[in-house]
């Protein structure tokens, strides 16, 4: 670290006896411009040669019905080699056991990294942690309300709050019907803040033959919002005469 400008007159220090305690200060400090240029060049080269960061998505599963959507989303993202960071709420885990044959630890194995919903110190709770978006699937009305007012009581709502403040993409797969005016106002407020509200409404033009077909279409449309192409369902090509 340079203590003085490029070339410093240090007569004052010689007369005060400071060099008795700091002998190195008795030398004239000279910094070569070529040295600074070389050091800056090394730093730029190091930054430019850093490996590119993989596509990274934060996924949260809350306690609304439709947990199969979250599971299928994780499966597809893994197939596409997308890095995933997963948080499952207490009631998300309970709903998972009730609606599917999956156990939370099996679903966690689909993700690149998982976190406890209580661990608000996890990396995804910080704006300095870079990611390409967050998906809450399914998103309960409780989670929707908490995110809308910035009530960050757990890691899911904190990570969502950070995504909003950092202007990163946040998509909520809201699962409830019918919707009250409170639900709709919460959705409208978040939509105005740039959040994507994604009710998993199935498309029947695909002629779904099973629950799996319905999941494929919804998951594919979710990923469309993040610029991730998943060839999981037939896309609309206009009405064709038979």
UniProtKB/Swiss-Prot annotation:
One of its GO terms (cellular component) is mitochondrion. The activity of wine yeasts to decarboxylate phenylacrylic acids is one of their biological properties related to the production of phenolic off-flavors (POF) in winemaking. Keywords: Flavoprotein, FMN, Mitochondrion, Prenyltransferase, RNA-binding, Transferase, Transit peptide. Flavin prenyltransferase that catalyzes the synthesis of the prenylated FMN cofactor (prenyl-FMN) for the ferulic acid decarboxylase FDC1/ubiD. The prenyltransferase is metal-independent and links a dimethylallyl moiety from dimethylallyl monophosphate (DMAP) to the flavin N5 and C6 atoms of FMN. Involved in the decarboxylation of phenylacrylic acids like ferulic acid, p-coumaric acid or cinnamic acid, producing the corresponding vinyl derivatives which play the role of aroma metabolites. This is Flavin prenyltransferase PAD1, mitochondrial. InterPro entries: Flavin_trans-like, Flavoprotein, UbiX-like. Oligomer. Dimethylallyl phosphate binds at residues 205, 221. One of its GO terms (molecular function) is carboxy-lyase activity. The keyword Plastid does not apply. It comes from the Eukaryota. It comes from Saccharomyces cerevisiae (strain ATCC 204508 / S288c) (Baker's yeast). Its EC number is 2.5.1.129. It holds the Pfam family Flavoprotein. Belongs to the UbiX/PAD1 family. GO terms for biological process: catabolic process; cellular response to oxidative stress; cinnamic acid catabolic process. Disulfide bonds: none annotated. It catalyses: dimethylallyl phosphate + FMNH2 = prenylated FMNH2 + phosphate. The gene is PAD1. Its main location: mitochondrion. FMN binds at residues 63-65, 89, 140-143, 175.
